[in-house]
């Protein structure tokens, strides 16, 4: 078993689930799917940690249930977050006889520096996709999935991509092991992309990594937005109607021009664009303030899940589910 983890990062709807499924086709790789224990880092702020950390983690995103790990298999005397991550993630990898352990999670998009500090020898794979396509996919997923309907998810995605790129470049300059790929290349030429990844993490290439046939996708959430990765073909859906609101589409284009100018055309990926406006000082300032406020709210939500009595959280979740079901019934009556 390797001493340091492998983390797979990318924005939501950018191909991280596909990449996870292909990576785990390798017999030596055993990544968890959106374990995200680091999101609940507040569990370990108290000296000695919280004894119910595993129960709260499982309540947060059913990570243990999805990976068929019994709650009593999680050690209760863990005092530090890195030790908790090692204990469970390595246990999961050992279950399939793998030596490469870690996690793929889009919710780590602004956690890169923190993960690198916690695991200095960790390796990172970052997948990029055209920001406009990321946001389109988020809006399509929101048609059926309530998580993507949260206010500001496309805004988080657009500016989270930029945050992740800045962190990625800075950490690479510091010598952190980061391998970058693009979604379109993965779909069009999975063999070349997966061979390069194998060279990066120093494992022999396995041809099974180029196909979804026989892939274990049991830990992936249900939902129509995961129908592609749960199918048998690596392909993107073409010729779909536009779903981006005109104003937000124009904003994405302005920022894409700005970021390509700043990177001399190397990032972000996507089709060639015509010359046009870039965002001004007021727009960039207000957008960044909005992004930071949203991420502060996300951090507060995670903090609440770490300390509020679980019974109260269960009652809140049941009430939220009932409200959603009632809203669905009302929507059906209006059709």
Kindly label every feature range from the protein language model.
Residues 92-209, 219-232:
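PAPS-dependent sulfotransferase catalytic domain
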Residues 1-5, 199, 203-335:
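PAPS-dependent sulfotransferases, especially Golgi type II membrane carbohydrate sulfotransferases
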């Amino acid at each position: 078993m390797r001493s340091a983890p492998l983390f797979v990062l990318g924005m939501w709807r950018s191909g991280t689930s596909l990449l996870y499924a292909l990576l785990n086709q390798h017999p030596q790789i055993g990544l968890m799917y959106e374990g995200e224990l680091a999101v609940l880092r507040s569990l370990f702020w108290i000296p000695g940690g919280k004894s119910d950390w595993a129960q709260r983690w499982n309540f947060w995103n059913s990570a243990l249930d999805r990976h068929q790990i019994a709650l009593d298999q999680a050690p209760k005397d863990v005092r530090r977050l890195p030790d908790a991550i090692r204990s469970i993630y390595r246990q999961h990898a050992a279950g399939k006889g793998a030596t490469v352990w870690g996690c793929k999670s889009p919710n780590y998009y602004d956690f890169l520096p923190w993960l690198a500090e916690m695991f200095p020898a960790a390796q990172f794979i970052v997948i990029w996709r055209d920001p406009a396509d990321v946001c389109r996919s988020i809006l399509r997923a929101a048609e059926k999935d309530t998580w993507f309907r949260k206010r500001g998810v496309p805004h988080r995605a657009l500016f989270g991509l930029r945050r992740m790129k800045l962190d990625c470049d800075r950490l690479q300059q510091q010598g952190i092991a980061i391998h970058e790929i693009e979604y379109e290349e993965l779909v069009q030429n999975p063999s070349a992309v997966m061979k390069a990844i194998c060279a990066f993490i120093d494992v022999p290439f396995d041809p099974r990594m180029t196909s979804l046939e026989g892939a274990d996708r049991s830990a992936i959430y249900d939902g129509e937005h995961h129908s592609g990765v749960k199918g048998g073909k690596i392909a993107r859906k073409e010729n779909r109607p536009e779903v981006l609101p005109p104003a937000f589409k124009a904003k994405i284009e302005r920022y894409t021009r700005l970021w390509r100018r700043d990177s001399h055309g190397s990032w972000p990926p996507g089709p060639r664009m015509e010359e046009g406006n870039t965002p001004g000082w007021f727009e960039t300032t207000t957008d960044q303030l909005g992004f930071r406020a949203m991420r502060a709210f996300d951090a507060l939500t995670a903090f609440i899940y770490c300390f509020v009595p679980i019974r109260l959280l269960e009652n809140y979740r049941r009430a939220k589910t009932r409200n959603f079901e009632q809203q669905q019934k009302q929507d059906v009556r209006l059709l």
